[in-house]
Amino acid sequence: MLNAGAIPIGRTNLPEMGLRLDTDNPLRGRTFNPWNKKLTPGGSSGGEAAAIATGMSPIGLGNDVGGSLRNPAYCCGISSIKPTIGRVPGVHSGAMENIGLIAPFLTDGPMARKVEDIKAGLSILAGRHIDDPNSVDVPLEGKMPEKFKAALVKEIDGIELPPATVKEIEEAGKILSENGWDVEEVKAPELDKVFDMWGVILVEGGMELAPKE
């Protein structure tokens, strides 16, 4: 980003160690949702999402293991994307091998108010870096499919989705369909087992991050 002419403004708030869907910590305090203080800005990149939503900066950076870019973007009404692992090189100050099983799920990505800015930011971030052997240098855009397809999931075993959530999912499917997408309502298999497995992975990662005596 610096090589492309970006001017860093500052660092924004996040919860301790990340991995939380809210943004609060003892050092900097709580970050509020910019549109309603009674709601969360999401996490763990909640400070960045709130700053972008209020116009403090046009574009920002965060990282995502299980939703830390996507969740705050949703909560604050902005755009983001979790790039495919390896698309954006993971060049960090800490050793990634020390965070356990969650390491292969971690990737950096852009946050912005507009999808067009996400596209521009991702084009700058993406590519191979000598310090990340998992990074790849492949084109961001390829041959477009003849027909776009979307699977609509409105039910998850063991979880009762709020009616408002189901309504928004249906509305999203309607908009896609009106724009030429092939939208099919499906039942995703074994999502309940996915939650169990993900819980184990997160707990293991937390143990790796815990102070050692």
Regions found by a protein language model. Give the residues of each.
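Short helix-loop capping/hinge segments that flank enzyme active sites or metal/cofactor-binding pockets
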Residues: P145-V153, I201-E213
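A short helix-breaking turn/cap at a secondary-structure junction
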Residues: K82-G173, E190
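Generic beta-strand/beta-sheet core signal
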Residues: R11, G62, V153-E155, V186
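Short glycine-biased active-site loop of nucleotidyltransferases that positions the nucleotide triphosphate
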Residues: R70-A73, E141-M144, W198-G199
